[in-house]
């Protein structure tokens, strides 16, 4: 998933850069391609509920909107998105106000409605529910589990990787450092995330904080 999202942003850079060198502006054409991707994603969703193309087509508009920014601003925006700003706000709000309740999306009801028709409905009924309740369930799950912010961040990082030429052989050492740093960061974060329920009982703090640390959430069970 992460590799696919990075490559989505990277491929945008390649196309945009090639067109820019020819004196063309690729942004409007890419927006049109996102619309086509949205349509293709819905065709796919007619038969497979958990597809990601619709999410990519919606989040993908961040690329033409930011591609003319300087590298430092793109990197800063990507980092902001990676820390899950909305769940982080919920954590701070819940810490300051014990009565605050994290807003919830009825994800479970969307899935239940979808599975009920998939189990007992005919072909046309299944297509209909997949395109409505099924898509709402899929997008709600992505929202509950931080995938919207994360996907946008990975798109931006993929574009930035293209700008910096980090996929070239001479930058192999950079990826070795990234791997080492990721391994070092993973274990304490994973351990901290697993210990949180033992110390935090307020779900309005626990759920978004777990999302910020590990991109895991039990919100879909609500």
Task: List each language-model region with its residue ranges.
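Aromatic-anchored segments of alpha-helical transmembrane domains
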Residues: 38-45, 82-90, 184-193
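Solvent-exposed interhelical
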Residues: 62-77, 160-181
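Membrane helical hairpin/interfacial module
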Residues: 1-47, 53
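Long hydrophobic alpha-helical segments that form multi-pass transmembrane helix bundles
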Residues: 80-157
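Hydrophobic alpha-helical membrane segments of integral membrane proteins
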Residues: 46-62, 73-78
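Membrane-interface interhelical connector segments
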Residues: 197-209
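Conserved small/polar residues in nucleotide/adenosyl-binding loops
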Residues: 215-222
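Hydrophobic cores of alpha-helical transmembrane segments in multi-pass inner/ER membrane proteins
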Residues: 5-10, 151-159
């Amino acid at each position: 998933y992460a590799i696919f999202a990075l490559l989505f942003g990277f491929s945008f850079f390649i196309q945009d850069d090639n067109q820019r060198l020819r004196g063309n502006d690729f942004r409007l054409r890419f927006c049109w391609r996102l619309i086509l991707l949205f349509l293709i994603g819905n065709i796919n969703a007619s038969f497979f509920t958990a597809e990601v193309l619709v999410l990519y087509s919606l989040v993908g508009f961040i690329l033409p909107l930011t591609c003319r920014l300087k590298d430092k601003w793109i990197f800063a925006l990507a980092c902001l998105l990676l820390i899950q700003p909305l769940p982080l706000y919920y954590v701070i709000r819940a810490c300051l106000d014990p009565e605050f309740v994290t807003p919830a999306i009825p994800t479970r009801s969307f899935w239940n409605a979808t599975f009920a028709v998939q189990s007992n409905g005919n072909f046309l009924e299944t297509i209909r529910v997949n395109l409505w309740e099924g898509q709402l369930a899929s997008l709600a799950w992505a929202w509950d589990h931080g995938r919207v912010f994360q996907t946008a961040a990975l798109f931006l990082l993929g574009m930035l990787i293209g700008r910096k030429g980090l996929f070239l052989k001479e930058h192999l050492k950079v990826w070795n450092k990234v791997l080492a740093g990721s391994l070092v960061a993973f274990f304490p974060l994973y351990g901290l995330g697993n210990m949180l329920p033992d110390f935090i009982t307020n779900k309005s703090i626990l759920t978004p904080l777990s999302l910020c640390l590990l991109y895991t959430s039990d919100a879909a069970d609500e």
